[in-house]
Amino acid sequence: MLVALVIKGTNIQSVDEYYLTHIDDIRPDSETVTISIRCDTVLSNLDDLDPALKQGDYIPSDGVILPPTEYVLRPGDTVFDILDRAVRYNKIQMEYQGSDENSYGSVYIRGINYLYEFSCGPLSGWVYRVDGEYPNFGCSKYELKDGQNIEWIYTCDLGEDVGCEWVGEETAK
């Protein structure tokens, strides 16, 4: 009888479920990072937007899917880990291709908030930057440090419209 009472009063959670319900437990000594998700470039390119996305609330009127939000940084966390945690916690749709499913060896973000690669023209898709810099490698390979700022930005022009200049194998601000 006692075992039944203990089990009934116990909330059994996976590690991910626990961390998602304790995501706001930021203490003064916590290492943190900030993440935001924006698609404001779409607002200037509505003629190119997939007609199915023009209906409903897929594109926020200000282009902000997730305002800058702070998350606890755990050892070994990557840009992808924080994105995954943020979209789960905020119930934002995301689809990605695993690192074992492509030739890049890193996770590839296909879509966020139902906005996918090519949803707003042939050069559109998701890019990320950390502390204002666009890395030239995948999000699951970028290990984060305390205090860094991650921005996921939807581009409609292969990054040019968001300040990313692709230069061969390197990228610049």
Task: Give each language-model segment a name.
Residues 1-173:
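Ubiquitin-like/PB1-type beta-grasp interaction modules and other compact soluble beta-rich domains
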